[in-house]
Every structure is written in structure tokens, then in C-alpha cells.
Amino acid sequence: GFSLEGVVAEYTAMRPAVQRRWQAAPGTIDEGITDIVRFDEAIDRVLSDSIAWYLSRVAHGRDLFLGVLGHDLRTPLGAIAMSAQLLLRDESLPERSTKPVLRIFNSATRMQKMINDLLDFTRTRLGGSLPTHRLPAQLGPLFRHTVEELAALHPDARIDYACEGDLSGNWDVGRLEQMMSNLIGNAIQHGDRAQPVSVMARGAEDTVVITVHNHGAPIPVELIGQMFDPLTQGALQHRQSRGSDSGLGLGLYISQEIARMHGGDIDAQSDESTGTTFMVTLPRA
């Protein structure tokens, strides 16, 4: 029933205790040194084996947890979303039923996104990494498709999109689409709905720079550096207080992980006069 820290602490305490007993025992110095060296080697070997066993159990638990989330939760949600989508396409659906069915579809879609975010969070926090598959691709059509999907999902929001320069590179297009969906969705959720969300992708010599900007109440200065940490309670409370659709608050963290796995990063700026801007810098290679 030991934790990893407890195992290391026990072996750490054992080593000096045994060495002190050897020092007090009769015998030659050479014999004592030889025994101590052998003892240290044995302790190091047992400690290494114990850590390896512990990490294998952690990996097993992680894989089991991800399997439950990935199958047992996503499967029924997928069935709900698909059924709602089929009903929405049915021309015989009464008009009074359209709004409730659309609400079911949107809620199921939002839950699927939360589960995907939780899966990614669990992978990264339990020692894993996000699975990636990078290929040569153009980001312009991908981002335009993402903007169109979010505009359809949020008909009361306006999204302005523009791109310039070369947006080609080696990208995991699925992950970058996920990142853009998170950032734009965050801007829609926390921004002023009376003003548009602005999305800009610009190709530079060695990088592609993406900005997502929204007007509205600024992020407090003391929280700017914490917005990408899902375990910072203050940042979570701030995000959750801004609307009922805040979800798990993992979107920004996962977006930063996606940018970093491409060798880039995300910065945030926010003030009363200009609003909030998230800027993603991605190297092409």
C-alpha cells in the first residue's frame, strides 16, 4: 500500500541506517567498504524494480480509465447525437419539436467535446502524450471549415475570418482543428456577442501565426499566466463564472499542448480597451 514517494522514502531511510550499523561493527575497512558497495547496488536495483512495477500499474490504470471513457461514455453519446441529427433532417418533424431536438444535439456534441478534452488531459497528466500524425498540409481550408462549423453551431455569434501568406507546413490537421475550435469557442463564450470574433492566420517566413480576438470583459492581469493551467482554481472559477457552458475548463490547456507538440506556443493578452487576444505561433517544420 505504499505510494511512489513512500517507497523512495523507505529505501532512502534504510540506506543510512544500515550503513551506520556497518560502521559500528568490528572488521577491516576494506571488508566494510566492499559490503557497503554491494548493499548500495542491491538497494538501487530493488528501488529501480519497485519504481518500474509502480509505473506499470499507473500505466495500466491510465489505459483502463481511457478505455472506459473512450468507449463506455462516447458510444451512447454518439447514438444520441446521431439520432437527434436524423430527426433534424426529417422534414415531417413538427416545427415545435425542432428547438428541443436541436438542444439535444448541441448538448450531446458539447458532452462529446468534454469527454475528448478529458481523455487528452488524462493522457498528458498521467505521463502520456497526445497522439499525433503530422503530414504536409495547408491550414487555410481547414481553418475556414472550422469557422463555418462553429458559426453554424452558434448562429447568434459573428465570426470574421481572414488569412494571408503561405499557410503550408507539416501539421497534424485534426489536432490543429481541435485547437482552433477550442480557441474560437472560448472567444464566443466569453466575448461580447454584439461584436464579432476575429480570426486571422498569417504565414511568415518560417512560421504561421494565428490570432483569435474577442471584445468584452478582460481577463484579470493576475490570471493571464494561469489561464492555461486547468488545476489553478482561480482561473477555473473565472472561466466558469462567465457562462453555463464552460465545461471542464480544459480547452486552453489542451490547445497549448497541441501548439507545443508542433514546436510552438500560445500567448494571451487582455485589457479593457482592446479586448482579449490569443496568439498561436507554429513553426512550419
PLM segments and residue spans:
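Short helix-loop "hinge" at the ATP-lid/N-box region of the Bergerat-fold HATPase_c
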Residues: 187-188
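Conserved catalytic submotifs in the C-terminal HATPase_c
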Residues: 133-136, 158-168
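Short alpha-helical segment of the dimerization/phosphotransfer core of two-component systems
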Residues: 106-111
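Short conserved segment of the HATPase_c
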Residues: 219-231, 236
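Short alpha-helical Gxxx[C/S/T] motif in the catalytic ATP-binding
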Residues: 251, 255
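Long, amphipathic alpha-helical coupling/dimerization segments that relay conformational signals between
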Residues: 1-66
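Conserved glycine-rich
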Residues: 263-264
